[in-house]
UniProtKB/Swiss-Prot annotation:
It comes from Ralstonia pickettii (strain 12J). This is GMP synthase [glutamine-hydrolyzing]. Keywords: ATP-binding, Glutamine amidotransferase, GMP biosynthesis, Ligase, Nucleotide-binding, Purine biosynthesis. Pathway: Purine metabolism; GMP biosynthesis; GMP from XMP (L-Gln route): step 1/1. Catalyzes the synthesis of GMP from XMP.
Length: 539
């Protein structure tokens, strides 16, 4: 029996990152809504409890509280952001609105006299104070500590950035240790889970495979499953996992919606039908998709249309299978959280994903999403454990709506053809260019990255078609053609991301090739936006 950590979700966009960090410590955990019953908390028998953040305010939403059993069990509790504030309010402290809200990078003075932060710091001030580089996102602040608590951390604008009652094992921080921007966040969470709570680090991906296979078999029984295969990492791993569970009860449907990458159709069929010996049906629905997208410019409308058409194609194919009752998808957690689909339903919707937002209530198939609670890096780890080839598992992710969300505004076949070729050039150059010692010396990569391709050093890279024209000069003549943007990011979980600092020589070569080889494009720009505030995809 694994030790378990209970994460209570108050509606934060990054709650699942807490689970990701706990799993990285090889400790089993589950996320549940903050309003579960006291009986549920007791029956769960957690080794520790973590309270998530929230976009809500403790003094405006008096119902958003942790169950009383959290405080009665006698197990260690860690509050994060809103979790700290509700801990303060529920245990006799005070929270007030702050006239100096903090969103983004901050430096926190760590008061290292507690077990949680002892010897954990990023640097020390000339006065000898330990400092942490963290990520803040709060508008309220704790102004009075609950009885029995002492100060854990502080900033000039947030005097109580952390607090602790070590006698009861209660700790709380105003910043977010779960996001990668908080440099010592993983160390802090591991300290809490492994040392303070004493949880055993015995949960590994092999356990998840066994549990997922068992769950799929129990859920599906002897019914058939149809899966929409895109060739991307998520749907590929989902297909392999489901195939391991139920074999030929799975039929993969590969839909060519006219918005795929260059030569993707051939690659998908060769890989899945040829190498994996799975049942794959190839459907050319490009005319259907492009026809419905004609004249549509709103990003949400485009995503909804693409999702709707996917469902219609799947339903049509399912009717050809005598026992098809399930529609499987490679939905992963970032898709769910950006669609406001967290377990509490309290997270704010950022944008709809076709996997989770395009399914009508009248869908005649039940939904099977075996990767729904996993992050991209976990999905890759799962794929390797399932025996999938490296080139499949570590291929950059591709959105379900395809180039439809990489063409700003109206989607046209002409635009898709231009974008396909520009994107292929970008990816080809990334694959063919290796990081050098000079790149490392310039801070573009680490010393251990020298010799790796820039494709492997970026988490996701692609081109975006901009429906605007720019004046250029080719030979002795004037041109007036479209603009394309290049986007490359580095991330571990796709919930937050940094733009990739690619070498200028590489970017210059990509730009030169696109302008010279893709007639219809006259200018190339590079996107230097992080996530947040921008999302990785432009639409």
């Amino acid at each position: 029996m694994h030790d378990k950590v209970l994460i209570l979700d108050f509606g934060s966009q990054v709650t699942q990152l807490i689970a990701r960090r706990v799993r990285e410590a090889h400790v089993y955990c589950e996320i549940h809504p903050n309003d579960v019953s006291d009986a549920f908390v007791r029956e769960f028998a957690p080794k520790a409890i973590i309270l998530s953040g929230s976009h809500a305010s403790t003094y405006e939403d008096h119902q958003l509280r942790a169950p009383q059993a959290v405080w009665d069990l006698g197990v260690p509790v860690l509050g994060i952001c809103y979790g700290m504030q509700t801990m303060a309010v529920q245990l006799g402290g005070k929270v007030e609105w702050s006239d100096h809200r903090e969103f983004g990078y901050a430096e926190v003075r760590a008061h290292g006299h507690t077990r949680l932060l002892k010897d954990i710091q990023d640097f020390a001030t000339p006065e000898g104070h330990g400092m942490l580089k963290v990520w803040m996102s709060h508008g309220d602040k704790v102004t009075e500590l609950p009885p029995g608590f002492k100060l854990l951390a502080s900033t000039p604008s947030c005097p109580v950035a952390g607090m602790a009652d070590e006698a009861r094992g209660y700790y709380a921080v105003q910043f977010h240790p779960e996001v990668t921007h908080t440099v010592q966040g993983r160390a802090l969470l591991e300290r809490f889970v492994l040392e303070i709570a004493g949880a055993k680090p015995d949960w590994v991906m092999r356990d998840h495979i066994d549990e997922a296979v068992k769950a799929i078999r129990e859920q599906v029984g002897d019914e058939e499953v149809i899966l929409g295969l895109s060739g991307g990492v998520d749907s590929s791993v989902a297909a392999a996992l489901i195939h391991r569970a139920i074999g030929d009860q799975l039929t993969c449907v590969f839909v060519d919606h006219g918005l795929l990458r260059l030569d993707e159709g051939k690659m998908v069929m060769d890989m899945f039908a040829g190498r994996l010996h799975a049942k794959v049906v190839h459907v050319d629905a490009s005319e259907q998709f492009l026809g419905h997208l004609a004249g549509v410019t709103d990003p949400e409308a485009k995503r909804k249309i693409i999702g709707r058409e996917f469902v219609e194609v799947f339903q049509a194919e399912a009717k050809k299978l005598s026992n098809a009752k399930w529609l499987a998808q490679g939905t992963i957690y970032p898709d769910v959280v950006e669609s406001g689909g967290t377990k509490t339903k309290k997270a704010t919707t950022i944008k709809s994903h076709h996997n989770v937002g395009g399914l009508p209530e009248t869908l005649g198939l039940k939904l099977l999403e075996p990767l729904r609670d996993l992050f991209k890096d976990e999905v890759r780890e799962l794929g390797v454990a399932l025996g999938l080839p490296h080139e499949m598992v570590y291929r950059h992710p591709f959105p379900g709506p395809g180039l439809g969300v990489r063409i700003l505004g109206e989607v046209k076949r002409e635009y898709a053809d231009l974008l396909r070729r520009a994107d292929a050039i970008f990816i080809e150059e990334l694959r063919g260019t290796k990081a050098t010692a000079q790149d490392a010396a310039a801070g573009l990569c680490g010393e251990g990255d020298v010799g790796k391709s820039w494709y492997d050093l970026t988490s996701q890279a692609f081109a975006v078609f901009l429906p605007i024209k720019s004046v250029g000069v080719m030979g002795d003549g004037r041109t007036y053609d479209y603009v394309t943007a290049l986007r490359a990011v580095q991330t571990t979980d796709f919930m937050t991301a940094h733009w990739a600092h690619l070498p200028y020589a590489l970017l210059g070569r990509v730009s030169n090739r696109i302008i010279n080889e893709v007639r219809g494009l006259s200018r190339v720009v590079y996107d230097v936006s992080g996530k947040p505030p921008a999302t990785i995809e432009w639409e």
